[in-house]
Structure formats: C-alpha cells, structure tokens
Amino acid sequence: MLVHMRKEPASHRTWLRAACLRLCRLHFCLLILYGVLVGVYDSAHLMAPDIIMKRSVTFGILLVANTALWYAAHKEVQKSSYYKWLIYGVVLIDLVLATVSVYTDRGVASRDVALFALPIISAAVLVNRSAIYGTAFLSLAAYVAVSMRYYFLHPNEMLHVEIYGMLVFHSAIFLAVASLLWVVVRARK
C-alpha cells in the first residue's frame, strides 16, 4: 500500500538550506575568532595551560562538527526536517562552546556568559517559538549546571547570595533575549 505524502514547498526548503549554510559560515568565523583568542591568551600567559588545553580541544572538536554540518547542508534533500536537524546541530555547537567557556573562566563570574545568547539567536533561524524558548531553557539549564558545578568545586570565590543573584539575573536575560527574538520572528512571518 502506497502512502501519499504531502510535498513540501520548495521555497521553504530552499530558504532553510540557505539559512543553514549561512549559519555554518558565520560559525566558521566565530570559531576561528575563538581559536585566535585562545592562541593570544596562551602567548600572553593569561590563562593556565590546562584551561588553554581544554579550550583548544573544544575549538578543534567544534570546528570539525561545524565543518561536518556545513558539508551536510550542501546536500540537497527533499525534506525540510533534514535542514532543521542541521540547524539544531549548530545550536548544540553554540551550547557546548558557551558551556565550556563559562566553566573554564570562573563559572558564574565569567565574562563569557554572553555566549549563551548565541544558541538562542541560532534557534531563531528556525522561525519557531518552541525552538527559540526551548533553546533558551536549555541555555539556562546548561548555565545553571556549569555555574553550580564550578561553584561547588571552588566555594570560596563567591558568596551564596551573590551566585544565586547572578544566576537569576542571567537566566532572566536569556528569557528576555528569547522573547525579543520571538517578537521579531513573529513580525516577519
């Protein structure tokens, strides 16, 4: 028995493919900049060698992952869900980059907390409220988990009230970014 499948509009699929390719190219630039900064921090002795090693390994793995996603996006496929999954892969790259950066840079006190906005912004390419808010909550969960892990390993770096205040503040910022992106995306639909 043959099942009749509804054909997806080619324009949406083509748009998703182009968006995925652009997103991967932008992430090449982001990851190259990240690698250069790791090199600069290493040459200036601004970070401990073990942190430089963790960031270098992360850079290498994410660069390979982004290259694989970029290569996969070049393939023309009839289903738009294929490109959606590739974009989810880019979102995952952003989450890993932000999580490792925050953990290796003093947890909640890190300046790299802003990197958690990247997966939310990348998810906005999907033009889907669930993807945007789901990614915001994933970013929030990863941030809280990595910050608390760092805090419990280094308890003398911050006060309890200070860490909880920063966690609530940054979590609210992640949700505000998601809400603002949804307003922009919904207006363009």
What feature does the model see in each segment?
Residues 1-84, 183, 189:
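N-terminal juxtamembrane segment and adjoining first transmembrane helix
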Residues 36-61, 79-85, 107, 126-186:
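Alpha-helical transmembrane segments and their interfaces in multipass membrane proteins
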Residues 60-65, 92-96, 111-119, 164-172:
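Membrane-embedded alpha-helical segments of multi-pass membrane proteins
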Residues 79-118, 132-138:
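Subset of alpha-helical transmembrane segments and adjacent helix-loop junctions
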Residues 118-127:
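Membrane-helix boundary/interface segments in integral membrane proteins
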